[in-house]
Amino acid sequence: MANSFERIYAVVKKIPRGTVATYGQVALLAGNPRWARVVGYALHANPDPEGIPCYRVVTKDGRTSPAFAFGGADIQRALLEADGIEFTEDGRVDMAKYGWTGLG
């Protein structure tokens, strides 16, 4: 599992400021599209929150995680807003606008 986590962390480190990725997208880019839950476990165990920006990972519909390991959904939202990401009226990230393509 440790090797899986390292692959996940490598992907998350690439998510640029001002964009977000989904759990499923990180799983796919880490090598296994069925790892969405593993991505969640890895992010919860993140050994370096400042170096691995796990707050940039959201659900497929743009929602923050209610179980965000480093302070809850409100902290995750504040971190994303500090990155320049805006939220819709219903509290979601506009994935068409802020979703990372995984390229570059």
Regions found by a protein language model. Give the residues of each.
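Nucleic acid-binding interface residues in structured DNA/RNA-binding domains
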Residues: 1-104
